[in-house]
Swiss-Prot record:
Keywords: Chloroplast, Elongation factor, GTP-binding, Hydrolase, Magnesium, Metal-binding, Nucleotide-binding, Plastid, Protein biosynthesis. It holds the Pfam family GTP_EFTU_D2. Its main location: plastid. It is an enzyme of class 3 (hydrolase). This is Elongation factor Tu, chloroplastic. InterPro entries: EF-Tu_GTP-bd (IPR041709), EF-Tu_GTPase (IPR050055), EFTu-like_2 (IPR004161), EFTU_2 (IPR033720), G_TR_CS (IPR031157), P-loop_NTPase (IPR027417), Small_GTP-bd (IPR005225), T_Tr_GTP-bd_dom (IPR000795). It comes from the Eukaryota. GTP hydrolase that promotes the GTP-dependent binding of aminoacyl-tRNA to the A-site of ribosomes during protein biosynthesis. GO terms for biological process: mitochondrial translational elongation. Residues 174-176 are annotated as: G5. Residues 60-64 are annotated as: G2. The lineage of its organism: Eukaryota, Viridiplantae, Streptophyta, Charophyceae, Charales.
Length: 408
């Protein structure tokens, strides 16, 4: 693991790029890191370094969510570059659930596309609180009126999904032109290039419009596991974003979910962006080195938690809203015995919906799109469940419902 110690001098904010495939999300991410590296210690990242997984590069499409870091004068950011390809919305659900705000990238040459709207809907569903818009590829648009039309169209799309579209900052520019300018002259300062200035303008909007979140550090520690890897000679590292609480070196923790057995272990190392930590706080993306745990013992979808604070369950009761067709949901009703996927934190588990009733206690045999119902769910394997926990229900590549657990 890393040797340099991470210094906390600025508020930490989790942000991400969302939007339609090929509208320039990864190019913009690279342009931001290169622009801000001029005035900070953060490492600039080239497009190829962000679009890193081999299967992504081959298709020119981002698959896994890629984490990079950068800082402005006011804040330290962890940035997740979200997939834009329809098959990989699953990753966006787990990636976007970690965002304190998002940059919606829309090509000024094309305007909003189906995935633009799907990503806005998903951002709403997983609780991304604020969105800032970057109209990319401005260099390809000669007519100012077209820019204004796209601006209007994007704002309308945001309003349709209950974001304050009339108040959302919209910055136009060209990530590619900024990237080219920075590649030719890496230390380009503000005021030297109009395209680089647009990136600064975008980050000013992000700094001022996306609020610094209040972190839940008083509650018992919990971190959903996103990824797991082995470090030779050191052990197994689990990565994820701390949902609540504080984790310190030497803490005893439990691994919970995906099987009945709860394992106990000790935290022997902590790091964030390859720098050592003494402790990790709610909201931070960290790597946790765990004593005596093999890679086969732990996987994405489990949680690491303070002992005795959360348990694995397969059966729970929840209050659920089933999306209407216009909201991207099902077109037809479903019945008891229906087996969709349940997305809970980073877990993705099939479950059987055993029974449902309306809020007033009336029983019903079928559930229609647009209904609010209470339902009993039986999962095929146990996951860490608690009251008031939110989840998404998905089927065939789309979200069909969202719910909150009230009993287990």
């Amino acid at each position: 693991m890393a040797q340099e110690v991470f210094q906390r001098t600025k508020p930490h904010v989790n942000i991400g790029t969302i939007g339609h495939v090929d509208h320039g999300k990864t190019t913009l991410t690279a342009a931001i890191t290169m622009t801000l590296a001029v005035n900070s210690t953060c490492t600039p990242k080239k497009y190829d370094e962000i679009d890193a997984a081999p299967e992504e590069r081959a298709r020119g499409i981002t698959i896994n969510t890629a984490h990079v870091e950068y800082e402005t004068a006011l804040r330290h950011y962890a940035h997740v570059d979200c997939p834009g390809h329809a098959d990989y919305i699953k990753n966006m659900i787990t990636g976007a659930a970690q965002m304190d705000g998002a940059i919606l990238v829309v090509s000024a040459a094309d305007g909003p596309m189906p995935q633009t709207k799907e990503h806005i809907l998903l951002a709403k569903q997983v609780g991304v609180p604020s969105i800032v818009v970057f109209l990319n590829k401005e260099d390809q648009v000669d007519d100012e009126e077209i820019l204004q039309l796209v601006d209007l169209e994007v704002r309308e799309s945001l309003i349709n999904y209950e974001f304050p579209g009339d108040k959302v900052p919209v910055v136009s520019g060209s990530a590619l032109m900024a990237l080219q300018a920075l590649t030719e002259k890496p230390n380009t300062s503000r005021g030297e290039n109009k395209w680089v200035d647009k990136i600064y303008e975008l980050m000013d909007a992000v700094d001022s419009y996306i609020p610094t979140p209040k972190r839940d550090i008083e509650k018992p520690f919990l971190m959903p596991i996103e990824d797991v890897f082995s470090i030779q000679g050191r052990g197994t590292v689990a990565t994820g974003r701390i949902e609540r609480g504080i984790l310190k070196l030497g803490d005893i923790v439990e691994l919970i979910g995906l099987n009945e057995k709860i394992r106990s272990t000790v935290v022997t190392g902590l790091e964030m962006f390859r720098r050592l930590l003494e402790q990790g706080f709610a909201g931070e993306n960290i790597g946790v080195l765990l004593r005596g745990i093999e890679k086969k013992d732990i996987e994405r979808g489990m949680v690491i938690a303070q002992p005795g604070t959360i348990e694995p369950h397969t059966r729970f009761e929840a209050q659920v809203y089933i999306l209407r067709k216009e909201e991207g949901g099902r077109h037809s009703p479903f019945f008891a015995g229906y087996r969709p996927q349940f997305f809970v934190r980073t877990a993705d588990v099939t479950g059987v919906i055993e029974a449902f009733e309306y809020d007033n206690g009336d029983k019903t045999r079928m559930v229609m799109p647009g209904d609010r119902v209470k339902m009993i769910v039986n999962l095929i394997c146990p996951i860490a469940i608690e009251k008031k926990m939110r989840f998404a229900i998905r089927e065939g590549g789309r979200t069909i419902g969202a719910g909150v657990v009230y009993k287990y």
